[in-house]
Structure formats: C-alpha cells, structure tokens
C-alpha cells in the first residue's frame, strides 16, 4: 500500500511542469448591447383590458355581484380625487423626481455593467455596477422628462465596451373632466357579473360618489395610449363625475356627489403646476336637461310640446322651449371654462383659481354625445313608452350636429308643428364652440354611432352601444348611458384623436 501511494505521488509531481506551461484562457471580449423603456404608469397587470385598481380593492369578490365591503391596499394606478388610500399612503404620481425608466443590459456579454446618464455635458446619474445575470441585468431609474444620453459600459476582465443611446423621457399627463358619459356611469368594474348573472347587485366603483370607473372611455383611451409605445408612459388624472354641469362640477363643487371643490381645483390639488398634455371633457348634457327630456318623453306623448316633469326644463313652458333656451346658454358656459386650461380663471362662485398648466401643443378634446336613438336597421327606436316620433325628434334636435330651423315635428295627432331651432343642437353647440376656442372635438364619438348605417341605440339589441332601462330599482343609474361596448368605442375614438389606432 505504501509503495502504491509513493508511485502515485511521483506521477502527480512529474505532471506539474506540464500543467504550469498551459496558457491561461482570456476573458471573453465584452459586448455592450443595451435598451431602455418607460415603465408603464397606466398599468394593466392582469391583462383584462382596463387600468388596474385605485388605492383599495374589495378583499374578495371584486368582480362578483356582491363584492366584499372590506377593502385592502392595491397599487395606485389612476390618480383620482377621493381615492381610497389604504393606510393613507400617497400615490406614486406625486413623485417630484420624475418618471421610472427601465434600463436593460441583458443582451450584453461580459461580467459587469454600469449606466451613466447625462444631459449635454452634465452627468446626472450613474448606476451602481452590477453583474450581468438574468436577475440583475435590469435596473430602474427615475428621471424628469427631457432628452438624455444613456451610456452603457460593459466590463470583462481588463477590457470594456461602451454603447451610447439617445433617449427622450416622456410621460403623457392626461386629465379627464366631465359628466357621467366620461365617468363610465353604468359600467362599474364588476359590470360583467351583472350582465351575465343579473340578480341583486352591488356595483364596485373606483369612486362611489361619482360612479367613476376605469371602464370609462377616457380611462380606456389612456390605456391604449400607454400600450401604443414602450418609449412613453401615461399618467391619468380622472376627475369626471356623474351629474356634473359646468357650474356644479367643472367650475364649482358638486355636493350631491360628495365633491366639495370643483373638478378644476381637484386636478390642480393632485398635480400642482405639472403640465397637461391631453385633456378630455364631456359636459353640456346635464346643463341643457337631457335627463329631463328622457323622463318627460317616457311619461308624456308628444314630449317636445309637453311640460317637463323634472328640473331644469320644468322651469319652461314646454320641453322644446327649455331645450333651446339652455342650448343657447351653453357656448358662453363653455367659454367660461376655457381660461382654466392654461391660466387663471374664474370659478362658478366668482372666486379666482390659478387654473391648470397646459404644455405646449396640449390638446383639449371635448366629447360630443353619441347617438342612442336608433335601432340596428337604422330606423328610430320605439322603446318602452317613447315612440319613434319622439326618438326622431330627440336625435334631430339634440344630438345631430346640425338641424333645420324650424324643425318639422309631427305629433301623434294634428298637423305638423314648426319648432324653432334658433340655438341649434347640443352637439352642434359643442362642435361650434370647440372650433371657436381652439379645441379639438372627438368627432368620432358622434360619427361612429350617428352617421353609421347601423344604429346602436337603446333598442338595437346586440348592436346596442347604450343601456336601455337598467332597472326599476337598485342599479338604475346606467339607464340611457353607454354600455360596455359604447364606452369601448368612446375610448377608441379618443385614442384615435391622439394618434393611436
């Protein structure tokens, strides 16, 4: 045994000179291959097609008929007044340092990497040196908007390689103001459960007082814009509220919805002097009394000549007279809003507000109202107690951009009446005033529903883009509002205006 060990030891010793003469293998030459993307700010982590929840979600059954009344924390991905902030945590959108950018070195070859971020000749940030591994090859930095040079340095042994990337950090700040057609009324997050199961229903809203939902068209447009490019991100400030008017909503408090300040003030409190890129606004329907029209038409035949049964039109001798008076006031009301978009303005109570800061080239996108009056074959609806003549009148004198003056209305009995149309239509006033103010209306919201050969109104069955009567009791607020498909179309048309197909 001893002899065998000695022989083995001698053999190993004799091999040592040979091993020492082998060359040391050089480290592989480094390759610098980097990329960058903006971290999405309008997130859809569960890929359901809608921006994720606000500051809190039901502890269970969020999308069921009866969600839990206990809320738990979740990521804040929509900035809204009256957010449900679990634990009082502030939202990410208040970060004054800027917006998150993800830098990736995963396609590089080497041992370690570092990013150097500069503007002109000034280095603004250098990341810690990290190893190139699957778990460590990405790093996130927070940067203000602007133009940058991202320099990736990859090291391998004593060698290094460098790659320079030019980048523009851009976050679109989008603000959504307005009424129920913008807030997503009728479309709580758990609407699918109600549509498929019916029965007792507790709607889960992002904001209970305003019946605001991420299923609303402006929120869907924000997500479309977010997903259109990895080199930009989108921050949505969502303040639209069901029931809003110019003075009770946009320029003043809306106590019935729990809003103690105007939407302009609410947005200002959230973003301060940060510049807005896109602002959508849906307003006018409640100002002119559209709900009063629907209620009266449901209860009275020949409703344009009937006395309105609810405010605000009950203050006038008949529905038609009240509508024309109210539509005639709308351009001046919209003009009072305009100064708030870019400078100081006067609120509804006469007090002064610094208004909202608008970036150079910002877009103000007024939203006309869609056509809810036609059947799938294009003819006027006859729905519940509202007959075709009154649906035709409502379409022609409220929703179409232009109308004959006078308007020939044929009541159920007697001769045709020539109804004065000196103030035009609701949508006509929106389009005309938008042109005067330099706003860019989302024409497609009207044309997709109103100019198409197929009707998408409340009686259009599977082609309907609007709810009919959603219930006698309980969940009634969605009646005569855009349904799931209708809000999808609104989101699509808003996105088109900002260049997203």
Features from the language model and the residues they span:
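Conserved SGNH/GDSL esterase-like catalytic core that processes O-acyl groups on lipids
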Residues: 193-325
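Short, hydrophobic/glycine-enriched beta-strand segments
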Residues: 172-184
